[in-house]
């Protein structure tokens, strides 16, 4: 029997909450590939649960900024030089320099997973000098790639056109968790009021222009609702301050990042999931966020903005409504109108449960395995 190629997958994020890299590593391991997943450990990271594949986490002095990215790539590069691997899998542009250079020296194959339109994220578009550095790296490295994939067809098409690289698509759909793996939580366990309709807003990267601020401001007009944020991100603390300053602490609560099983348990207790990304940059315009599929897997309807990839899923599977106006009163009105028709909510829930049978990792992972099997 031929031995499977050894794979090292590198990502700059926290391995505890990055579901995409976990799903990929798990599927590769189950397919017989020896897998080592390399990431980082923040000071506030949760303990890493037991996983069937090998894991290595780097601790660094810096947690953000140029020194952090430089230190991570240097550490990763030196680490990769000491390890045997046939395939090096770079997750996003911020690991690709180290991965590509190590692969060039060692003769390994490079596979690239672009989780987003990296150089168009607002954190970079608002800082043109930093963006220019990353864009130069992208222009230098991407044309050299032979094995690449991304999260949706819109982003794949942009990269194909710009760099002439045949990007495949592996969507960000979740694992189908067995019922016994999901904690048996109730609203009472979480101390949620029993007489409120609950809106959930997920995200490990709740950053600027994700619609979180608008959701909070809409709560001024929704006194019989509860808004639950689950996750973290660049604006998470600012959101807490805004809720406090507006006196909305009885209507808006914040939960930290959760393990996937706990996140699923919390999400399915909500009535509706919110996906309110704004079309303020190319990355958001063409995004297909994890939370959309997490809501569907949890069997709850979705209220989403009209960014193309999200709208396509919501309308194709009829799992929710599309809101076009995020001004506080307008958004609140849309939410109230949504709940004014119990039959519609019930239909959306039923459709979400049906869509979950198709929009899950068991179906999607075959695309990843095909890319790895035919890596050049």
Q: Where is each model-derived feature located?
A:
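A short, well-ordered alpha-helix in the C-terminal region of glycosyltransferases
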Residues: 330, 337, 344-358
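Short hydrophobic beta-strand element within catalytic cores of glycosyltransferases
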Residues: 272-275, 294-304
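Nucleotide-activated donor-binding/catalytic signature segment of Leloir-type glycosyltransferases, i.e.
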Residues: 237-265, 272
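Conserved donor-binding/catalytic core segment of Leloir-type glycosyltransferases
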Residues: 7-10, 193-220, 228, 349
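Membrane-proximal helix-turn-helix segments that form the acceptor-binding/catalytic region
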Residues: 74-82, 101-105, 129-150, 162
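Conserved acidic donor-binding segment of nucleotide-sugar-dependent glycosyltransferases
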Residues: 317, 321-328, 337-343
């Amino acid at each position: 029997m031929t031995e499977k190629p050894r794979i090292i997958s590198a990502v700059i994020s926290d391995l505890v909450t990055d579901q995409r890299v976990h799903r990929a590593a798990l599927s590769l391991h189950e397919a017989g590939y020896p897998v080592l997943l390399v990431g980082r450990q923040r000071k506030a990271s949760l303990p890493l649960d037991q996983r069937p594949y090998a894991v290595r986490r780097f601790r660094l002095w810096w947690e953000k900024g140029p020194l952090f990215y430089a230190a991570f790539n240097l550490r990763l590069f030196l680490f990769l030089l000491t390890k045997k691997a046939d395939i090096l899998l770079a997750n996003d542009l911020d690991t690709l320099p180290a991965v590509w250079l190590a692969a060039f020296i060692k003769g390994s194959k490079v596979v690239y997973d672009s989780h987003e339109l990296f150089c168009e994220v607002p954190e970079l578009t608002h800082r043109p000098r930093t963006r220019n550095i990353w864009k130069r790296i992208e222009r230098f490295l991407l044309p050299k790639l032979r094995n690449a994939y991304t999260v949706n067809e819109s982003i794949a098409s942009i990269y194909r056109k710009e760099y002439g690289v045949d990007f495949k698509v592996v969507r960000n759909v979740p694992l189908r968790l067995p019922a016994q793996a999901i904690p048996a939580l109730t609203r009472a366990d979480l101390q949620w009021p029993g007489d409120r309709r609950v809106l959930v807003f997920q995200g490990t990267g709740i950053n600027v222009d994700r619609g979180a601020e608008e959701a909070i401001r809409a709560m001024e007009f929704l006194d019989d609702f509860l808004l639950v944020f689950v996750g973290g991100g660049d604006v998470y603390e600012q959101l807490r301050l805004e809720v406090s300053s507006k006196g909305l602490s009885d209507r808006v609560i914040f939960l930290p990042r959760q393990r996937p099983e706990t996140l699923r348990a919390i999400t399915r207790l909500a009535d509706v999931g919110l996906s309110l990304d704004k079309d303020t940059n190319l990355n958001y315009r063409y995004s297909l966020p994890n939370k959309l599929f997490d809501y569907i897997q949890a069997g709850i309807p979705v209220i989403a903005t009209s960014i193309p990839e999200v709208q396509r899923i919501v309308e194709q599977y009829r799992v929710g409504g599309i809101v076009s106006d995020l001004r506080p009163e307008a958004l609140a009105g849309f939410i109230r109108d949504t709940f004014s028709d119990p039959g519609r909510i019930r239909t959306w829930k039923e459709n979400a449960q049906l869509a979950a049978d198709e929009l899950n990792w068991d179906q999607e992972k075959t695309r990843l395995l095909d890319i790895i099997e035919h890596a050049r």
